[in-house]
């Protein structure tokens, strides 16, 4: 049974966000809409130390104080359908994650479509992962997490890291990850009306924005079709 808070959020998304994803929509319009919604929902300063950092040119933010005060590191890849970033919402979420887990959270701002289509964001996420490895963060507890598009990018990052013989995280947490851009499973259609956020129009549009002309069965786009052998424990 969904909690009262979950039911409220689902209704809010169904009435404010889902109608925006319609045929012929403009990504700039969606960004303006989500920015207005974010401004209404998130107010007040964060009650946690933050630090802006460049990951070899990729902007990112640390959430949490000095490394010595934390039990480990969490690399979080934000969602947003590969074309949106809600910095205030994800800053708040990263702060909560740091507080609850005792880990220092790194939130990179990977490049977004349509200005930077696939594989730009995929490459940025692996670069952020390598940046942490190069600085020894894997020597302590180390986790990877992401939601929606960020969940997909988390899976892809681990698959690429494994194939490159890089150390893998201790575990990964995937929140509603997008794993199949082909939408070939029957449930993708018959559950479309139940989805509180994305309409069938969005499911058809977003791959054309993110990866135009690409084979959607490519595991870097649809990790469902990739090799999951050797990945760390997933939640």
What are these regions (language model features)?
Residues 50-52, 56-235:
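Alpha/beta-hydrolase superfamily serine-hydrolase fold, recognizing
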Residues 1-66:
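A glycine/proline-hinged amphipathic helix-loop "lid/cap" segment
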């Amino acid at each position: 049974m969904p909690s009262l808070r979950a039911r409220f959020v689902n209704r809010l998304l169904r009435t404010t966000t889902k109608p925006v994803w319609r045929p012929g929509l403009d990504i700039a319009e969606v960004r303006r809409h989500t920015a207005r919604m974010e401004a209404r929902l998130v107010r007040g300063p964060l009650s946690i130390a933050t630090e802006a950092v460049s990951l070899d040119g990729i902007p990112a933010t640390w959430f949490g104080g000095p490394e010595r005060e934390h039990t480990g590191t969490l690399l979080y890849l934000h969602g947003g359908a590969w074309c949106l970033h809600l910095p205030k919402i994800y800053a708040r979420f990263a702060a909560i994650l740091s507080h609850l887990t005792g880990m220092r959270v790194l939130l990179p701002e990977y490049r977004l479509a349509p200005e930077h289509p696939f594989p730009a964001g995929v490459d940025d996420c692996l670069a952020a992962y390598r940046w942490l490895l190069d600085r020894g963060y894997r020597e302590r507890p180390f986790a990877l997490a992401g939601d929606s598009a960020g969940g997909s990018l988390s899976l892809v990052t681990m698959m690429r890291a494994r194939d490159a013989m890089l150390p893998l995280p201790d575990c990964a947490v995937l929140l509603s990850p997008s794993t199949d851009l082909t939408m070939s499973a029957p449930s993708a259609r018959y559950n479309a009306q139940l989805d509180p956020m994305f309409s069938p129009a969005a499911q058809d549009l977003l791959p054309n924005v993110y990866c135009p002309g690409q084979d959607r069965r490519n595991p870097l786009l649809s990790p469902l079709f990739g090799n999951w052998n050797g990945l760390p424990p997933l939640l």
